């Protein structure tokens, strides 16, 4: 397979992945928000592009257990980095430079409306 064909196939997978991520995470009890940030959210599409995913999940699980659960659930066939905060952690981190940058550039995929 040529590099161009490989790139085209990977870009197709990249472009299908956000919908799949939403399908999987919207079913998970307690997930309140899912967004993309980073190179994909900024429009980059090549073999070096990964998906940077921010998840806000209302759960009592510890951070490593949250991440382990999310990575095992999110089988999307592309490179992916996941950041997961509880709602309290998300509120606490909003004023920190990293999360401020993420929120400026994010593409919101899913947000649970308050009941």
What are these regions (language model features)?
Residues 1-33, 41-48, 57-115:
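Catalytic core of pol beta-like nucleotidyltransferases
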Residues 52-53:
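Structural signature of the urease/amidohydrolase superfamily beta/alpha-barrel
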């Amino acid at each position: 397979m040529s590099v161009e064909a490989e790139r085209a196939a990977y870009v197709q997978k990249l472009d299908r992945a956000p919908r799949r991520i939403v399908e999987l995470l919207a079913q998970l009890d307690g997930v309140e928000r899912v967004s993309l940030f980073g190179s994909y959210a900024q429009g980059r599409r090549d073999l070096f592009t990964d998906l940077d995913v921010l998840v806000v999940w209302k759960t009592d699980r510890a951070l490593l257990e949250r991440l382990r659960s999310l990575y095992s659930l999110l089988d999307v066939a592309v490179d992916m980095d996941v950041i997961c905060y509880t709602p309290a952690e998300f509120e606490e981190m909003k004023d920190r430079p990293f999360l401020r940058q993420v929120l400026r550039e994010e593409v919101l995929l899913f947000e649970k409306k308050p009941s």
